UniProtKB/Swiss-Prot annotation:
ATP binds at E336, G362, G363, H364, M365. One of its GO terms (biological process) is glycolytic process. PANTHER family: PHOSPHOGLYCERATE KINASE, PHOSPHOGLYCERATE KINASE 1, CHLOROPLASTIC-RELATED. The lineage of its organism: Archaea, Thermoproteota, Thermoprotei, Sulfolobales, Sulfolobaceae. It comes from the Archaea. This is Phosphoglycerate kinase. Keywords: ATP-binding, Cytoplasm, Glycolysis, Kinase, Nucleotide-binding, Transferase. GO terms for molecular function: ADP binding; ATP binding; phosphoglycerate kinase activity. InterPro entries: Phosphoglycerate_kinase, Phosphoglycerate_kinase_CS, Phosphoglycerate_kinase_N, Phosphoglycerate_kinase_sf. HAMAP family: Phosphoglyc_kinase (MF_00145). Its EC number is 2.7.2.3. The gene is pgk. It is an enzyme of class 2 (transferase). It comes from Sulfurisphaera tokodaii (strain DSM 16993 / JCM 10545 / NBRC 100140 / 7) (Sulfolobus tokodaii).
């Protein structure tokens, strides 16, 4: 059992899941090459192998469901290739079934032997899966009514889609004993540290270009007094600098205007006035019109801001070393250009070398991890969350977690 944000999330150990028939919801949604239709990255598929292997080792019959893309998009493809890759990582055959709720799929599920697994076709070929609704409503869909009677347990291991309220994510927990899979368990355990008052000081490193989303996170952290320091970078830092009255120069103001961010200045100013522990860069790496790079102080910027500066890196790194929990989301600079990755990589390095527990989220931030860095799972958590992580940090409810909690309440009679 894991407790997070007043929710009790059941895990596999809370039930006797041995030699049973299990419906496992995973998230193996992967980037697709538009020309060939082949998968470009299989990291999500690889990550789910642990839960599947464990369930098979316990002689369970495992029925796997997942999605890939959305109807009408180039990445809306079959899961047939996924099943082959999944088989490779699990070390056993995961048979692909070209059906979801039809007679063929139901027959395959009924005849599935112990220690065997099948992967059903892309669950989003079922139109109901595209509709978001409350768990009570989703529990009455054809998807749930057709598959639930065929299994004993439901396990959700799809944290990356925990912010969706679709039938495969929230419908089954209301009609079957349900638990979090290993990925879901790790994500929830790591994120619970963020709001655990005993794990302080808490340092947040927030950057990137999704400024409105990041402001929402900061507002929630400030309102609930979660953060001890919020270290800003990227466009988020520029917005706070302007809100503070710092003149970043006409070119940078033009960048903010072109991205429609000037309207957010009053909101950023309100956050500053609330006493939120916001740290703003004291210098920046800028690119001058000539193409020359310069390290300029915040109040004398001579070009377009591309990264945080050297002094800021030193100051931020010292703050990070003090943290008991360090959460990083969003890069400090324009990391698409190798010249402007120093700030992001330096803070990642400081975090990994710090004595604190580190949570790294967001695809851009994760991509900046050096390939040779050894990730100690007891100290560093690399989140697969994406949108789910964003909403969790912003204080929004995650329907999939809410549904697992509801299932526990219904099964145990406890709240």
């Amino acid at each position: 059992m894991i407790k997070v944000a007043d929710l009790n999330i059941p895990v596999i150990e809370d039930f006797d899941i041995n030699g049973r028939k299990v419906l496992l919801r995973i998230d193996i949604n992967s980037p697709v090459d538009r020309k060939t239709g082949k998968l470009l990255d299989d990291s999500r598929i690889k990550a789910h192998a642990e839960t599947i292997r464990e369930l098979l080792d316990k002689q369970n019959s495992v029925v796997i469901i997942s999605h890939q893309g959305r109807p009408g998009d180039d990445d809306f493809i079959s899961l047939e290739e996924h099943s082959k890759i999944l088989s490779k990582y699990v070390g056993r055959e995961i048979e692909f079934v070209d059906d979801v709720i039809g007679p063929y799929a139901r027959e395959k599920i009924s005849k599935l032997g112990k220690g065997e697994a099948i992967l059903l076709e892309n669950v989003r070929i079922v139109s109901e899966e595209l509709i978001e609704a409350p768990p009570q409503q989703q529990s009455k869909t054809f998807l749930v009514r057709k598959l639930a009677p065929l299994v004993d347990f439901y396990i959700n291991d799809a944290f990356a889609t925990a912010h969706r309220s679709q039938p495969s994510l929230v419908g089954f927990p209301l009609v079957k004993p349900s638990a979090a899979g290993r990925i879901m368990e790790k994500e929830v355990s790591a994120l619970s540290k963020i709001f655990n008052k005993e794990d302080s000081p808490k340092i947040f490193v927030l950057g990137g270009s999704k400024v409105s989303d990041t402001l929402k996170i900061i507002e929630h952290l400030a309102k609930n007094r979660v953060a001890d320091r919020i270290l800003t970078g990227g466009l988020v830092a520029e917005l706070f600098a302007v809100a503070k009255g710092i003149n970043l120069g006409k070119p940078n103001m033009q960048v903010l205007e072109n991205k429609g961010l000037l309207s957010l200045i009053p909101r950023a100013r309100k956050i500053l006035l609330s006493g939120a522990p916001i740290e703003i860069p004291v210098d920046f790496t800028v690119e001058k019109p000539s193409g020359e790079l310069s390290n300029d102080p915040e109040n004398n910027v001579s070009g377009i801001i591309k990264d945080i500066g050297n002094t800021t890196i030193e100051i931020y790194s010292s703050f990070i070393k003090e943290g008991k929990v360090i959460t990083l989301r969003g890069p400090m600079g324009v990391i698409e250009d190798e010249r402007f990755r120093i700030g992001t990589k330096s803070l990642l390095k400081a975090s990994i070398e710090s004595p604190g527990y580190v949570i790294i989220g967001g695809g851009h931030m994760i991509s900046m991890l050096d390939k040779d860095v050894e990730i100690n799972p007891n100290k560093i958590h690399v989140s697969t969350g994406g949108g789910a992580l964003l909403l969790f940090l912003a204080g929004d409810k995650l329907p999939a977690l809410e549904a697992l909690h509801m299932s526990w309440v219904m099964q145990s009679g406890k709240s």
